[in-house]
Amino acid sequence: MNKTSIFQRPSWVVVFALTAAIAWGWAYPLIKLGMSEFGILPDMTGCKMLFAGIRFFISGLIILAIAKMSGRSIGGRSRRGRQYNPRKFGVRKAADWWFILLFSLLNTTLHYAFFYFGLSHNAGARSAILNSMSVFTVVIFACVFFKSDRMTVRKAVGCVVGFIGILALNLGGKDSGRFTLLGDGMIILNALCGASASLLTRGLSKRVDVFVGTGYSLSIGGALLVVPGLLAGGTLPVVSLTGLIILLLLIAISTIGFSLYNKLLSCNPVGKVAIFNSLIPVVGAVTSCLCLGETFYWKYVVAGALATTGIYIINKEK
């Protein structure tokens, strides 16, 4: 008798997906607060890469350590030399490391390089809503690349409504925010990288245990941020207890968020999991305004409502 995994049970899918989404929503104000506490200015590229890299490198090591303690193999063979099931343990063959490297670049290095650059030049609330573009992009990409995810009228309408919401961010006067390449442009590139990485998660699960693969992607991707950051002269100009606490919170968000989200993507249709990220722009916008004292413009309500409505329309499909 086959038992359904807890990550495939509808009620638990909702709980785990929303937990990851809420955690990621809090990352917006925490990253900006962290850069402020560490004295990192918008033009300090190396420092931003170092700050991001430390977060993900440590998070990846924590996940790998937990994987090791829980009995998962991070090398592919048992102590007796027998090969594990490649779908469950370790890396099946050397060629699969290239896939893991690609996943690390998209899921961590490029994804968060663009994110940290964009967020340092943009308001947290605006960035959170703009980043909801990744949800609709995942739905569209999934319908193109996976037979199990088919484009339907509901999905099409939901995506259109969502994109209109994103365009609504540019309504109003200049004082309420306009498109900028260093701000909005970087966040859009971040969203595209995140969407692409979501599609690759299924391929990752065929090559290595998803939990182990997540640890690899975060640690490798984090290292690929730390090294160039150091080479560019990056440092943490000011180190304080508050800054370290914020960094620990960001590490926890990465560890919990990616572990849950990637596991869900490997067990369920991509589109059905990604739409729960509708909560990210809402949480990100609200927490940014509350924690950072940012001005809450009326267009944030319009954009957030349209984006959330679009994702709700997609999620209603059975």
Predicted regions and their residues:
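Hydrophobic transmembrane alpha-helices of multi-pass small-molecule transport proteins
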Residues: 63, 140-141, 153-172, 225, ...
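Hydrophobic/aromatic residues within transmembrane alpha-helices
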Residues: 34, 51, 118, 144-147, ...
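Loop-to-transmembrane alpha-helix entry segments
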Residues: 128-131, 147-168, 177-184, 240-241, ...
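Glycine-/small-residue-enriched transmembrane alpha-helix faces in small-molecule transporters
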Residues: 1-53, 177-203
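Helix-helix packing/entry segments at the starts of transmembrane helices
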Residues: 54, 108, 112, 126-133, ...
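Specific transmembrane alpha-helical segments of multi-pass solute transporters/efflux pumps
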Residues: 27, 70-127, 131, 168, ...
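Transmembrane alpha-helices of multi-pass small-molecule transport proteins
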Residues: 41-109, 137-141, 193-200, 214-232, ...
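Juxtamembrane helix-entry segments on the extracytoplasmic side of multipass membrane proteins
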Residues: 9-14, 44-49, 92-97, 171-193, ...
